[in-house]
């Protein structure tokens, strides 16, 4: 069922949540060398997906032990199974495809990693997402410690596909952009419920769109392309609240 949340209703529903800790970490950690080596071997066809998973499992098991050892009250898998903090989750949504890009929206100094982006190809939905199994493994090895799962915010999908991309052309279903915002929100409703049903009680939505919308240079560039960031930002608030 679709839940219609207006700003007033959201404010009425806000509750004060007291987490069982006074400090927290983002949740992404540097990959150990042996995991980076395994990823390279997988990319080159030297090992298969099951062999890579076994290495990931080992690295995550070791990381969780360290997190608990230093006193973290909520542990993560370090995002060790991901190539990117955001694209992996979004690309595994129904109706979304990862494609090559000429460059990232943020230019790195020194080494330039291969760029990628996303394209909306069909109705966006959430079904049988691999991140659910990722969480279940983490929850199992944590043995009762609170587990935090991190996923990109709903706004990141729209930002990447529709705002950053100068070549964006909506598919027939999304010529009315309200339908796009709605489908993204409903997909996230399903995702949040699925993680909850899997035992997740700490789901963090990571979002860099707001910082980008505050950047003077970015705002100028988007305005020159005819984009109204203030209007888009309001739509993001409504979409996240609906999600």
Set out the residue ranges of the language-model regions.
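Domain-level signal for soluble alpha/beta catalytic cores
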Residues: 9-243
């Amino acid at each position: 069922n679709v839940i219609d949340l207006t700003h007033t209703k959201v404010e009425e529903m806000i509750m004060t949540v007291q987490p069982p800790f006074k400090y927290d970490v983002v949740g992404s950690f540097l990959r150990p060398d042996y995991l980076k080596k395994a990823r390279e071997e997988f990319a080159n066809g030297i090992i298969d997906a099951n062999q890579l998973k076994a290495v990931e499992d080992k690295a995550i098991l070791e990381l969780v032990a360290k997190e608990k050892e230093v006193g973290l009250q909520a542990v993560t898998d370090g995002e060790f199974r991901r190539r990117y903090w955001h694209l992996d989750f979004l690309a595994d949504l129904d109706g979304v495809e990862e494609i090559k890009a000429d460059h990232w929206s943020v230019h790195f100094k020194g080494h330039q990693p291969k760029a990628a982006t996303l394209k909306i190809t069909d109705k966006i939905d959430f079904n049988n997402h691999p991140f659910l199994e990722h969480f279940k493994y983490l929850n199992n090895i944590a043995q009762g410690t609170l587990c935090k799962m991190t996923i990109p915010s709903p706004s990141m999908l729209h930002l990447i596909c529709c705002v950053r991309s100068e070549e964006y052309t909506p598919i027939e279903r999304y010529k009315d952009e309200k339908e796009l915002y709605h489908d993204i929100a409903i997909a996230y409703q399903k995702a949040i419920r699925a993680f909850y049903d899997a035992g997740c009680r700490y789901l963090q939505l990571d979002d860099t769109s707001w910082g980008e919308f505050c950047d003077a240079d970015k705002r100028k560039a988007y305005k020159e392309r005819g984009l109204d960031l203030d209007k888009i930002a309001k739509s993001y608030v409504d979409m996240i609240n609906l999600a």
